[in-house]
């Protein structure tokens, strides 16, 4: 699937660094959350996605980084509609990837197409 990415590798790395910092702050604030363990696990899952994509952005083109993010997104099990305490890590990774897609200006149609290919969790 061909994607058009207008951001440079440096812009992608800067944006991901910002997102990683937010996730780190969330990890540090988790103790004050209503459900501290869930909040921390969600933030850790997001942070790991941002770290993975940042590492890729060091050596790969912006298009390759987006393609990898789309591949990761497609491989996630579909857990939308499950209760809030279930599948925290999957929901955190999904949230991180969707934030990344917004950051790079991915066409919503592309994200929806990939999302429709995801398998439901069994």
Put a short name on every predicted segment.
Residues 48-64, 96-111:
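Amphipathic alpha-helical coiled-coil segments
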Residues 13, 20-23, 27-30, 40, ...:
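Heptad-repeat amphipathic alpha-helical coiled-coil interaction surface used
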Residues 57, 67, 82-84:
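Compositionally biased, intrinsically disordered low-complexity regions enriched
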Residues 76-122:
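Amphipathic alpha-helical binding modules
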Residues 33-37, 48, 71-74, 118-121:
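Short, surface-exposed, charged/polar-biased interaction segments
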Residues 8-27, 43-46, 60-77, 90:
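Short amphipathic alpha-helical heptad-repeat segments
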Residues 2-5, 29-40, 83-87:
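Alpha-helical rod/repeat scaffolding segments in eukaryotic adaptors/tethers
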């Amino acid at each position: 699937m061909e994607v058009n990415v207008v951001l440079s590798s440096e812009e992608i790395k800067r944006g991901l660094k910002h997102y990683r910092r937010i996730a780190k702050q969330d990890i540090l604030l988790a103790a004050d959350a209503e459900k501290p363990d869930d909040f921390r696990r969600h933030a850790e899952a997001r942070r790991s996605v941002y770290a993975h994509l940042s590492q890729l952005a060091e050596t790969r083109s912006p298009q390759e980084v987006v393609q990898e993010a789309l591949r990761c997104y497609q491989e996630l099990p579909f857990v939308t509609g499950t209760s809030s305490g279930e599948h925290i890590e999957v929901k955190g990774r999904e949230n991180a990837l969707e934030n990344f897609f917004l950051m790079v200006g991915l066409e919503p149609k592309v994200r929806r197409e990939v999302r429709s290919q995801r398998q439901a969790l069994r």
